[in-house]
């Protein structure tokens, strides 16, 4: 996990942030939702996730979109929209930092790439590109082990709400990764060979972490 410490930190902070988002917004209990302490902890983890690497911004956005969609589906958005709004303040530090960098001409290419469509469009209709990306992302040995543990844990102890939450997070993250790799200005195989194993750490940790959490989870109703 820590072979590439920044990626290891992203994985840990993302897993922790996902747990905090789940227990504060998604879980059917008021125990965490009524305690300011958990919101402060969530703010610290959310903010740290965005500041470690640019990838963290997308990961936190995924958590917010997932929570929003699940609450919308359950028709509970009106009740929790204010909580999502307060938690979204955690984006403010990275927005201010990016604005500062932009004003100083630092890291301009990190978030503005005018050639994205130029590289993306020619690769969209080539099925081989999707096969290569799927091979590097989904057939990683550690990812498969973590996924199997996750599935077995939910087979042993089914939790529909938690499973749906992690499944949506996984799907959105995979779609973003496909977009990023298809739009890379570098050779696709070389890009995957040099970076795929690092980004998969986040998914591997997510599945392993929530597989273990599911097995030990006890609902608190007060």
Regions found by a protein language model. Name each.
Residues 41-42, 160-186:
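Transmembrane alpha-helix segments characteristic
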Residues 17-38:
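Membrane-interface transmembrane helices that cradle and orient dolichyl/undecaprenyl
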Residues 61, 69-73, 80-157, 170-178:
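Membrane-lumen/periplasm interface segments of specific transmembrane helices
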Residues 18, 59-73, 215:
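Hydrophobic transmembrane alpha-helices of multi-pass, membrane-embedded glycosylation machinery
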Residues 39-44, 57, 61, 83-88, ...:
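Hydrophobic alpha-helical transmembrane segments
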Residues 6-13, 58-59, 190-215:
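Hydrophobic/aromatic-rich transmembrane helices and adjacent perimembrane loops
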Residues 1-16, 20-21, 52:
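Multi-pass, polyprenyl lipid-linked donor-dependent membrane glycosyltransferases
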Residues 21, 37-54, 62-65, 92:
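Membrane-interface alpha helices of multi-pass inner-membrane proteins
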């Amino acid at each position: 996990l820590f072979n590439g410490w920044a990626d290891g930190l992203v994985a840990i902070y993302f897993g922790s942030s996902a747990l905090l988002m789940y227990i504060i917004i998604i879980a059917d209990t008021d125990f965490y939702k009524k305690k300011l302490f958990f919101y402060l902890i969530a703010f610290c983890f959310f903010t740290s996730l965005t500041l470690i690497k640019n990838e963290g911004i997308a990961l936190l956005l995924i958590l917010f979109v997932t929570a929003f969609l699940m609450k919308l589906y359950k028709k509970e958005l009106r009740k929790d929209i204010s909580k999502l709004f307060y938690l979204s303040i955690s984006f403010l530090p990275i927005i201010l930092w990016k604005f500062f960098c932009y004003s100083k001409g630092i890291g301009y290419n990190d978030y503005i790439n005018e050639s994205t469509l130029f590289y993306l469009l020619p690769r969209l209709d080539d099925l081989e590109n999707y096969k290569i990306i799927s091979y590097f992302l989904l057939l990683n040995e550690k990812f498969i082990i973590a996924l199997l543990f996750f599935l077995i844990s939910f087979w042993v102890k089914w939790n529909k709400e938690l499973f749906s939450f992690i499944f949506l997070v996984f799907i959105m993250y995979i779609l973003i990764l496909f977009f990023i790799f298809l739009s890379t200005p570098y050779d696709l195989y070389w890009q995957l060979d040099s970076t795929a194993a690092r980004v998969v750490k986040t998914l591997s940790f997510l599945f392993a972490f929530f597989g273990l959490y599911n097995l030990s989870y006890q609902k608190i109703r007060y």
